[in-house]
Amino acid sequence: MALTRSFRETVTERARHDAAFRAALIEEALQAMLDGELDEARSLMRDCINGTVGFDALSTATQLPVKSLMRMVGPRGNPTLQHFVRVIHHLQAAAGVSSRVEVAPTDPGTHETP
């Protein structure tokens, strides 16, 4: 779904001033990635980058070119896991948060057994 510029600006502005919102963006991006919602994960990452460190500072911190970072989180981005993790790690450090994975059982009717 295409977002209007004003909505993106609103998200970016809120991320700049709200630590809990920044943490939630990172959490949602990671959850989207784990759920296979890669377009959503990239979009959330882009919002988080724009609302926190910005692409120039992220490029310096991760030693990845700005244009590569922008492509990574763009609509057709296909970041390597190594680069994605490097970006997440830096965003977490900048936001002062860390992540952990919690494994939970699925509903019995939603998975197949061998």
PLM regions: where:
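Short, Lys/Arg-enriched anionic-surface-contact patches
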Residues: 22-48
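The DNA-recognition helices of helix-turn-helix-type DNA-binding domains
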Residues: 52, 76-77, 91
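Short alpha-helical DNA-recognition segment
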Residues: 50-70
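DNA major-groove recognition helix of helix-turn-helix/homeodomain DNA-binding modules
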Residues: 81-98
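General nucleic-acid-binding
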Residues: 1-19
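Short, charged recognition helix plus adjacent turn
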Residues: 77, 97-114
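Short coil turns linking two alpha-helices in DNA-binding domains
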Residues: 65-68, 76, 80
